[in-house]
Amino acid sequence: AIFAPLLLLGAEAEAATETAPIPATRTAPVEDTAIQQLSMEFRHPVADGTLMRMICLIDVPAKNALSAEELRARGIDGEHFITCLGEFVGKEFADGRFQDIAEHYVPWTEAREADFRAMLDAHNLAAENDYGARAETVQNPAYNIVIAYQSGHSLHITSAGAALNEHENAVEDAVLTWVDDAFATGGKQTP
């Protein structure tokens, strides 16, 4: 299954309404160079394990992200690889087993990247940068977000633990609302 290897990079929800900006403890500008790598992991406890959503930039055959009509309209060969925002939803059971639930892909475009940057800026998420320190020490955080820019700079946003405080809940809600909206506007889903 494709899901287990993505855990090393360290998941389905209805589209949510727009969220209010997160109160800032400090401000930081959003990097203005192209995003080279994006990896986000969200973990939510359920009765017999953990529901996980992994969202990342990934190159996939265009047929995985676009309908046959869209491929024809754009003149793209379905086997041609394109960069997409990919989502992998799965469950890790308490006994260590994994179950893949769904995959979603939507093309990563300049407009989508600009929209992502606007969300980061609107919620002052660059100020949440912990420079990877939490990811080094927190086991199974509720969320772990890594954005690497072509400039060589990166943004690391990791929750302080498996349970979210009010501020961390607002961070997660802002990002997942953007993700849900991105997938609601196009792309394909594989159950």
Predicted features along the sequence, with ranges:
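N-terminal glycine/threonine-rich, aromatic-flanked beta-hairpin/loop signature
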Residues: 66-94
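Bacterial N-terminal signal peptides
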Residues: 1-7
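Boundary at the C-terminal end of the N-terminal hydrophobic targeting segment
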Residues: 10-15
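A short-motif feature that recognizes glycine-rich, charge-decorated loops
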Residues: 87-127
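Short, well-ordered, aromatic-rich surface patches in folded extracellular/luminal domains
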Residues: 16-71, 104, 119, 123-191
